[in-house]
Structures are given as C-alpha cells and as structure tokens.
Design a protein with these regions (language model features):
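N-terminal FAD cofactor-binding segment of flavoenzymes
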Residues: 29-86
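C-terminal helical "tail/cap" subdomain of flavin- and related membrane-associated enzymes
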Residues: 296-344
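N-terminal Rossmann-like FAD-binding beta1-loop-alpha1 element of flavoenzymes
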Residues: 2-43
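FAD/FMN-dependent oxidoreductases across multiple families
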Residues: 195, 221-301
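A conserved beta-strand/loop capping segment in the N-terminal third of enzymes
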Residues: 61-122, 127-130
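Conserved acidic residues
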Residues: 12-13, 146, 270
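Short, well-ordered alpha-helices that flank and scaffold nucleotide-derived cofactor binding pockets
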Residues: 28, 32, 110, 207, ...
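Predominantly flavin-linked oxidoreductase catalytic cores and closely associated redox partners
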Residues: 19, 33, 115-245, 258-261
C-alpha cells in the first residue's frame, strides 16, 4: 500500500487514471479548448501503450466535429457496406471510420508532451478521500488532486439478477493476400457463413487495400470465444475465400454487452469514464463515438467551472434505445441462434 505524502510537487488539479480511448479523448478536448493552460495534470498508466492493441470504428457523417478533430489519425474510411453475403450497398452519406489505437495513443502522447503533462508509469492501488482533495496511491507514492478521471473498468460483480450480461469476444488476423481480393471502399459485417457453436458468430472484414485486410471472427455469447478454435476457423475461412496469405498481426479482445448501468462515483471529485461511464452501447459493443461526445460534454462543463456535479457528468440514454438494447440482448441470451438471420 502506498503512503500519503504532503509533497507540493505531488499536488495536481486533475489526475487521469488510465490512458485508453475515453481519457485520451477527454484530455484532447480539454487541450483543444485551452482548459489546461493554468492546470497541473498527471496521468497514471501502468501500460506503455506502445502496441496497436485495439481498433476503434464508428459511424459518422463527414461534417461531424469528430472528423475535424481526429482526421489526422483516421486511417481508413468506407462509404459502402456488404452485410451477410448480400450485394455491396452505399451508406448514402454516412461513413464508417477506422482508427488504430496506437495512432490515438501516439497523437495523445504528442499533445501531452506539448503541454508538458507527465505520465506516471504505475498502477493505482487505492484512492483515499479527503474533504478537499483525493489521494491517488500507487505502490511507491501518492499524489494529491482536486479531481480524478477514472477509467478503470467497473466491478461487474455488482450485477443483479435483473441484468443481462454476455460477452462480445473476437479473434482477428491482419493479413496480406497474394491476389487482389478485397474491395477497397466496402467493409463487410455480419457474415454468418460460419458455424454458430451455441452462440451468435459471424465474420467481419475491414479492407486496408485490395490485398490487405483485417478478418475477424466475432462471438456474442455468455462463453468467450476460444482463441485456438477461432484461429483455426479464421485461417480456414481466409484460405477458402481469398487464397494464400501471410499474417501481419493478430487481434483479440472482449467487450461487455450488458444492461447493467454503473452508478456514478459516490465521491463528487471522481468522474467515471469509458466503460465505467456506461459509454459502450449494450447491443453492439460500439463506444468510440459516444466517448467522443462524452469528452465534449465534460470539456464544456469544465469551461463553465461547473464542478458541483463533476461526478455525475453523463450522456442521457433514451429509454426507447435502452428498451431495444435490452430486447436484443434477451434474444442473444435466450435464443442465440436467432441472432443469425434465416436464409430465404
């Protein structure tokens, strides 16, 4: 357990716990709006964030502010889609954007360096509350701060019997094929040309060029996908559909799909961010665009010096969409094979 120090150099206005997508988007918004000019800021992150460990995809129109803000790190965009072996269709004014996590991390690192914001490479062991401050403890030291952005995942053991919880787990290969086999401006999703294995499983293909793509097997189910099993399925699928190929990289992950809503922190100085702020859409696992909107809202409140309800900053979820999400999760939980459309 860390010990509390009263060292002046360890006192901060804001401490960010974690340097994932949500906290990156928040700090980028604060920097863009000049809200950290007179602030002392610290990031506490145990990972080096030097690997491309995730990909972020989102739907948007071209004139949305997210495109202006992140245009330098958007590596691919698509205006056409193919769903479950159907014909290629236009997205009609919408685009599907692709960002590599390493590009977001590096973009954030560059901005933090410009602002001389320090990153403490450590894991947070505890947060101790005081009347006027919070103390963030690591194994070796402590830092005092007025406000915390906490992106640590929620403790899902708080889920009640009323809540639904399934996993969206996936295994993907970034490949280069010998032949030109991919349409460059069309991505493919919900390709159910795969065994369902007691859940809902489908392929998802993001092309990077006519020869290069990410081919991913996604599973919606209580049990997470077995990566050895998935690897064999993906490799066989690629060989049968696209011919000979070489593997450039592997991508794995798991996203919670749940009706459980994490409560705001009881401490008015701590704002939950990311998954802990309920920013992942329960029925799809998409969250990046919502994290961006959340960052803009937080930035706006800080610009107005609204700190009285700092811990309760959130995006209002429409009840109608909450109902749809719940309905789809019930179907995926109770009747997983219904997740796959019937062939006509």
């Amino acid at each position: 357990v860390g010990h509390i120090e009263n060292n002046e150099s360890n006192i901060f206005d804001f401490i960010f716990i974690g340097l994932g997508a949500s906290n990156s988007l928040i700090v980028l918004s604060l920097i863009k709006n000049g809200l950290l000019k007179d602030k002392k800021v610290l990031f506490v992150e145990s990972s080096s964030k030097s690997n491309n460990d995730k990909t972020y995809c989102f739907w948007s129109s071209q004139n949305d502010s997210i495109i202006d803000d992140l245009s330098t790190i958007i590596s691919h965009q698509f205006d056409k889609i193919k769903i479950n072996n159907s014909n290629v269709q236009s997205l009609e004014g919408l685009f599907y954007y692709y960002i590599r996590s390493i590009d977001l991390y590096n973009h954030t690192f560059n901005k933090l360096n410009e602002e001389k914001i320090v990153i403490e490479r450590a894991e947070v062991t505890n947060i101790i509350e005081d009347q006027d401050f919070c103390f963030v403890l690591t194994s070796s030291q402590s830092f005092r701060t007025r406000f915390i952005f906490d992106s640590r995942p929620p403790r899902l053991y708080k889920i009640t019997e009323k809540d639904i919880y399934i996993n969206q787990s996936f295994f993907g290969l970034h490949i280069k094929c010998e032949n030109a086999v991919f349409l460059k401006d069309a991505f493919e999703m919900m390709n159910f040309n795969v065994e369902q294995n007691g859940a809902t499983q489908f392929f998802y293909i993001i092309p990077f060029s006519s020869q290069e793509a990410l081919v991913e097997l996604t599973r919606f189910g209580i049990e997470k996908i077995d990566f050895n099993y998935a690897s064999e399925l993906v490799k066989n699928y690629i060989l049968n559909e696209f011919g000979n190929y070489t593997i450039i990289a592997e991508e794995t992950g798991c996203i919670p799909m749940t009706t459980f809503e994490n409560e705001p922190s009881a401490n008015k100085r701590i704002l939950n961010t990311g998954t802990a702020a309920n920013l992942i859409k329960p029925s799809t696992g998409y969250g990046f665009k919502k994290m961006y909107s959340f960052a803009q809202k937080v930035s706006e409140q800080i610009s107005k010096n609204k700190y009285d309800k700092f811990n309760k900053s959130n995006l209002i979820n429409k009840k109608r969409f909450k109902f749809y999400d719940t309905l789809l999760l019930i179907i995926l939980l109770k009747w997983p094979l219904k997740g796959k459309p019937d062939r006509k």
